Amino acid sequence: MASSYTLMLFLCLSIFLIASTEMMAVEGRICERRSKTWTGFCGNTRGCDSQCKRWERASHGACHAQFPGFACFCYFNC
């Protein structure tokens, strides 16, 4: 009885692991690029995200540190 339970648990975990690795492969890569439409200091990530989506057709955007301050970066599906 205990060995059948162990076998069933092993099979369920194996199927779960195979399914989760397949899902990751579907997501694809995301490419990062500095915004071409944002100018100046980026202190508002929500504004950067909105501008990247509307003006540059990106998936999303965010402010990140870049010497000497912060810049808006847009993220696209590669």
From Swiss-Prot:
InterPro entries: Defensin_plant, Scorpion_toxin-like, Scorpion_toxin-like_sf. Residues 1-20 form the signal peptide. The lineage of its organism: Eukaryota, Viridiplantae, Streptophyta, Embryophyta, Tracheophyta. Disulfide bonds join C31-C78, C42-C63, C48-C72, C52-C74. One of its GO terms (biological process) is defense response. Confers broad-spectrum resistance to pathogens. Belongs to the DEFL family. Keywords: Antimicrobial, Disulfide bond, Fungicide, Plant defense, Secreted, Signal. Transmembrane segments: none annotated. It is found in: Secreted. The keyword Secreted applies. SMART domains: Knot1. The gene is PDF1.4. This is Defensin-like protein 19. GO terms for cellular component: extracellular region.
